[in-house]
From Swiss-Prot:
Keywords: Calcium, Disulfide bond, Hydrolase, Lipid degradation, Lipid metabolism, Metal-binding, Secreted, Signal
Gene name of the encoded protein: PLA2-III
Source taxonomy: Eukaryota, Viridiplantae, Streptophyta, Embryophyta, Tracheophyta
UniProt enzyme class: hydrolase
Family: Belongs to the phospholipase A2 family.
Cysteine pairs bridged by disulfides in the record: C55-C83, C59-C89, C64-C137, C76-C96, C95-C121, C102-C114
Catalytic activity: a 1,2-diacyl-sn-glycero-3-phosphocholine + H2O = a 1-acyl-sn-glycero-3-phosphocholine + a fatty acid + H(+)
Signal sequence residues: 1-43
Annotated source species: Oryza sativa subsp. japonica (Rice)
Gene3D superfamilies found in the cross-reference section: Phospholipase A2 domain (1.20.90.10)
Record-given protein name: Phospholipase A2 homolog 3
Binding sites annotated in the UniProt record for Ca(2+): Y75, G77, Y80, D100
Length: 163
C-alpha cells in the first residue's frame, strides 16, 4: 500500500514539474525576443566583435540534473549549443545537435516536430549508449532531464498549435 501511495505522489510531482516546465516554456515563447530563440553564436555583435564565445567547442558535463543549467557535450542544454561545424561529443550530443539544427531551421523552440524527433532519439539511447571521455554525468539521468523538459515543450507546442 505504501509503495502505491509513494508512486502516486511521485507521478503527481512529475505532473506538477511537467506543468510548471510547460508554463515556463510557454511564457518564454511569448516574451522572449526572437534573437533569444536559439543561441548558436551566429548573431551579430553590432560592433564587429566575434560572438564565437557564445557557442561551445568543448565537451562539457556540468549541472547534470538541473535543467536550466545543464551543459552536456557541446549541444545539450537550454540556450546552449556547439559552434558551427563542431562535431558532437557522443550519440546523446548528436541528438541534441540535430534538435538544435531543426529548431534553428524552423526558428521555433516549441516546434512539435523537432521536439518529438529529439524524444525519439533519446528513447533509442535508453537502450544503451556510450559517452565521451571525461564525462562526469550519468547519461541516463541526463536523458531523463532532457526528456522531461522536451515533453513540456511538446505540451506547450501543442497548446500553441506549433507544427
Amino acid at each position: 500500500m505504501a509503495r502505491g501511495g509513494s508512486f502516486s505522489r511521485l507521478r503527481l510531482r512529475a505532473g506538477v514539474v511537467v506543468a510548471a516546465a510547460a508554463a515556463a516554456l510557454l511564457l518564454f515563447a511569448v516574451v522572449a525576443p526572437p534573437a533569444a530563440a536559439l543561441n548558436i553564436g551566429l548573431q551579430s555583435a553590432g560592433d564587429g566583435a566575434s560572438k564565437a564565445g557564445l557557442c561551445s567547442r568543448t565537451c562539457e558535463s556540468d549541472h547534470c540534473t538541473t535543467p536550466p543549467l545543464l551543459r552536456y557535450g557541446k549541444y545539450c542544454g537550454i540556450l546552449y549549443s556547439g559552434c558551427p561545424g563542431e562535431q558532437p561529443c557522443d550519440e546523446l550530443d548528436a541528438c541534441c545537435m540535430h534538435h538544435d539544427n531543426c529548431v534553428q531551421a524552423k526558428n521555433d523552440y516549441l516546434s512539435t516536430a523537432c521536439n518529438e524527433e529529439l524524444l525519439e532519439c533519446l528513447a533509442r539511447l535508453r537502450e544503451g549508449s556510450s559517452t565521451f571521455q571525461g564525462n562526469k554525468c550519468m547519461i541516463d539521468e541526463v536523458i531523463d532531464v532532457i526528456s522531461l523538459v522536451i515533453e513540456a515543450a511538446v505540451v506547450a507546442g501543442r497548446l500553441l498549435h506549433k507544427p
